[in-house]
Amino acid sequence: MSLDINQIALHQLIKRDEQNLELILRDSLLEPGNTVTEMMAELHRVYSAKSKAYGLFNEESELAEALRQCRRGDEDFLAFSRAATGRLRDELAKYPFAEGGIVLFCHYRYLAVEYLLVAVLNNLSSMRVNEQLDISTTHYLDINHADIVARIDLTEWETNPESTRYLTFLKGRVGRKVADFFMDFLGASVGLDTKAQNRGLLQALDDFTAEAQLDKAERQNVRAQVYSYCNEQLQAGEEIALSELSKELPSFGEKSFQEFTAEQGYELEETFPADRSTLRQLTKYAGSGGGLTINFDAMLLGERIFWDPATDTLTIKGTPPNLRDQLQRRTSGK
């Protein structure tokens, strides 16, 4: 992994009681040795693999202005990180989920792109066995479960300030409150809506195949092609590119899929991240509620599974063997 650390700083927030978060600030930067570089490579990998929301700085963002000053050389990175940790403490203190932790600021480069990553990591205790087979306690950073993380693509921000996606943050296990916290701390607003982009793609695809008057098998084949391309992009960590996707699909009436989306005004970006849960709808029908969960391949609709919209009834012909076995045992009273 080609990851080069420019500067990295660690500070700490300690929750002393329900009202106060104590601030402990380092007086120097960390040396980016092998251990630190390995830690950042792991954090970069974990962060890149997780679902993220996108944003952009507001005009009045204090963090953005401080970052500009740091980039111009008006303030050094350590001073920037210390001041930002103070603002972070003030914002975190507003939320009941705030537990403190190790605050990390890292300016690094990965594949010719510069990033600033900000994270609050839990410092956990565990057990270890040494060479003499004695057991002792040890501490470690819980990187795999980090959910208070934000990253700024400095290259994108500085070369394309009109972008709506240079700032990303994790949605977090405690839901919307973490997103609100990041918006407040970063002085940012929501940017590119990846789910909306993916939903727009699916709607455009349905309209495209409908206009071409394809039969069910042909429509399903096109949807499978789109899913295959998008899933490959997702697995490779790449974005969906409309021009590339359009080349994968047949043209109907001398009109490509990309031309169709542009003419119909779907407002799709030229490239955008794939959303796994939304794209799954290309090949699956799924839903849950009221104690019922249903998930089946799209090709089965109209063949083994039938929906009557008038009565909102699904009829399934041929149940899975393990489900049938359970039904038989339960209904027979065994």
Curated annotation (Swiss-Prot):
Keyword Cytoplasm attached: yes
GO cellular component terms, A-Z: bacterial nucleoid; cytoplasm
Chief subcellular location: cytoplasm
UniProt cross-references to Pfam families, sorted A to Z: NA37 (PF04245)
GO MF, one example: double-stranded DNA binding
Tagged with keyword Kinase: no
Subcellular location, record wording: Cytoplasm, Nucleoid
Keywords assigned: Cytoplasm
PANTHER family given in the database record: NUCLEOID-ASSOCIATED PROTEIN YEJK, PTHR38772
Family assignment from sequence similarity: Belongs to the YejK family.
UniProt name for this protein: Nucleoid-associated protein ESA_01050
Organism: Cronobacter sakazakii (strain ATCC BAA-894)
